[in-house]
Amino acid sequence: MRGLLAGLAIVLMLSSCQTDKEQKPSPTPSAYRGEVTLGSKSLTEQYLLMKMSALLLKDQGYKVNEMVFLDSPAIRSAMEAGIADLYWEYTTTARIFYHKQTPIFDPDIAYREVSRTDAGNKIIWLAKSSFNSSWALLMRKDISEQLHIYRISDLADYIRTQRTKMKFATNAEYLQREDGLDRLKEIYDFELPDDQVVAIESDLLSQTVKDGRVDVAVGMGSDPRIKKNGLIILQDDRKVFPPYEAVPVILEKTLEHYPDIRTTMESLTPYITNENMLDLMYQVDILQKDITKTSRDFLVKNKLLAP
């Protein structure tokens, strides 16, 4: 789901106390709280989550090291080995790939179960955000409004009643997944012949919808090109897609040593929403803004950091 890759990770250590040009002067000895290592997968959304977390913890007096890992197995292994203290994980990633369990489609139950399982691994899941980096059905906003299609149920009703041959695009992975296109058609009760489905590269999905070459795409809800291309995400009202809600996870021993990290992280979590993350990724990926400045401006705007 998250583009997991096998093998050894390529890890880049970023010592924020040395490389962050925007950092304040090092905290005085009396303000110094300790040293923690934050991790990130190699994704823009993860860079943003790590950077915002690092800025807040540095503001609280921590020396923060930032490490970027190639993929999910690498960062999980680093946490289990005690190399990384904290990073942001996704509920269904943990459920499927770490715990080797079938997906749970209710977000609250999924969060509860991965939290319970990882407690036995000495890994603590803090409060979850509402940012859901999962699959999504994408449609042009103007066509959605014209046809009054705002939910996947609306789309299914339209296909059934209008007998229309709408064309879908997705990537090869979704076509092959057990919980992929066949589940979508079953849960929402509509037919979609093979000749109405095309498989293309993930990076091209939103552009293909924008250009009108297809009517709908099944892509990632965290793609910043959704905003750029004037698309909307149809509401998944029957929960066909498993939740990939982003949650800060921390080693139990680190949290015991620095219990105030929970408060710091949970001050940020309510602001990690789909809308905010899409906007932040749009600024970084599309407008090419600096990720540290973008993160700091967001925290200042929401009064989590002083100007």
Q: In which residue ranges do the predicted regions lie?
A:
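C-terminal motif of bacterial Sec signal peptides marking the signal peptidase cleavage site
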Residues: 13-16
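Bacterial signal peptide processing site
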Residues: 18-21
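Short, well-ordered beta-strand elements
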Residues: 30-45, 62-68, 163-170
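Short helix-initiation/N-cap motifs at beta->coil->alpha
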Residues: 44, 62-77, 172, 194-207
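Ligand-binding cleft/hinge of the Venus flytrap
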Residues: 53-60, 151-194, 296-304
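Ligand-binding "clamshell"
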Residues: 98-126, 213, 225-239
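A conserved helix-loop-strand patch within extracytoplasmic ligand-binding domains
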Residues: 109-167, 252, 270-274
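Ligand-binding pocket segment of bilobal, Venus flytrap-like solute-binding proteins
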Residues: 163-236
